[in-house]
Amino acid sequence: MRQRTIVCPLIQNDGCYLLCKMADNRGVFPGQWALSGGGVEPGERIEEALRREIREELGEQLILSDITPWTFRDDIRVKTYADGRQEEIYMIYLIFDCVSANRDICINDEFQDYAWVKPEELALYDLNVATRHTLALKGLL
């Protein structure tokens, strides 16, 4: 089984949290709402990976004013690729508290939508199990 280390930002701006809706046809949680983030590349430092993933998935314009390591967790997930293949992966999630200075987002094709959500409205979204666990651990659900 392949192992992946995943950097995952919990991004907050003015009391709201950023959620991204995964594409319907790929990823670990197709069609569900999630936090952004992705895998650490070989030789890449953790914060470099976090900033690269944010740039790739959310665009160059989003400015983070604070990044603080928060917690980690692990589990085994099945990833679905765009061509329909599936793979079981051991995932190690490194989760960061992030504060953004703005809300300028330009999502890539991994996502179909995004939203800045008030804490009291987070439970209204179809959150994937990993995001639900993270938000509950944070006391937001």
Swiss-Prot record:
Cofactor: Mg(2+)
Catalytic activity: a ribonucleoside 5'-triphosphate + H2O = a ribonucleoside 5'-phosphate + diphosphate + H(+); a 2'-deoxyribonucleoside 5'-triphosphate + H2O = a 2'-deoxyribonucleoside 5'-phosphate + diphosphate + H(+); dUTP + H2O = dUMP + diphosphate + H(+); dTTP + H2O = dTMP + diphosphate + H(+)
Membership in a protein family: Belongs to the Nudix hydrolase family. NudI subfamily.
Oligomeric form and interacting partners: Monomer.
PANTHER family listed in its UniProt record: GDP-MANNOSE MANNOSYL HYDROLASE (PTHR43046), MUTT_NUDIX FAMILY PROTEIN (PTHR43046:SF14)
Reported function: Catalyzes the hydrolysis of nucleoside triphosphates, with a preference for pyrimidine deoxynucleoside triphosphates (dUTP, dTTP and dCTP).
Protein name: Nucleoside triphosphatase NudI
Organism whose genome encodes this protein: Salmonella newport (strain SL254)
